[in-house]
Amino acid sequence: MRIAGVNLPLNKHAVIALTHVYGIGKTSARNILERAGIDPAKKIAEMSDEEAHAIREIIAEEYKVEGQARGLQQLAVKRLMDIGCYRGLRHRRSLPVRGQRTQTNARTRKGKRKTVAGKKKAVKK
């Protein structure tokens, strides 16, 4: 079954399968299923077309998902960078934003190590 351009895994419970859509977490998934009147433990493969349609309608009306949510996220980061705040500068320099240490660690954010040549050892005679 496809929702918001994402193929949901048929063998999983509805509440878990909905979290495969970017922008929908467990809480949102539970709220969607509650509004649609669907049991969260029901598997996606067992859902009728009417139930799938109800889920699609609720998501289309109330939630920003997939490309729309990613675009909003990018705009939020771009805004921080444009106003020149500390968080924006950290994003611009590809450094950790939330106060983590950077002398060691932070490899995920900084990327692969850029090696710097050390001092050459003097040859003893």
UniProtKB/Swiss-Prot annotation:
Signal peptide: none annotated. InterPro entries: Rbsml_uS13_C, Ribosomal_uS13, Ribosomal_uS13-like_H2TH, Ribosomal_uS13_bac-type, Ribosomal_uS13_CS. Residues 107-125 have a biased composition (Basic residues). Keywords: Ribonucleoprotein, Ribosomal protein, RNA-binding, rRNA-binding, tRNA-binding. GO terms for molecular function: rRNA binding; structural constituent of ribosome; tRNA binding. GO terms for cellular component: cytosol; small ribosomal subunit. Residues 94-125 are annotated as: Disordered. NCBIfam families: uS13_bact. Located at the top of the head of the 30S subunit, it contacts several helices of the 16S rRNA. In the 70S ribosome it contacts the 23S rRNA (bridge B1a) and protein L5 of the 50S subunit (bridge B1b), connecting the 2 subunits; these bridges are implicated in subunit movement. Contacts the tRNAs in the A and P-sites. Belongs to the universal ribosomal protein uS13 family. Part of the 30S ribosomal subunit. Forms a loose heterodimer with protein S19. Forms two bridges to the 50S subunit in the 70S ribosome. This is Small ribosomal subunit protein uS13. The lineage of its organism: Bacteria, Pseudomonadati, Chlorobiota, Chlorobiia, Chlorobiales. The gene is rpsM.
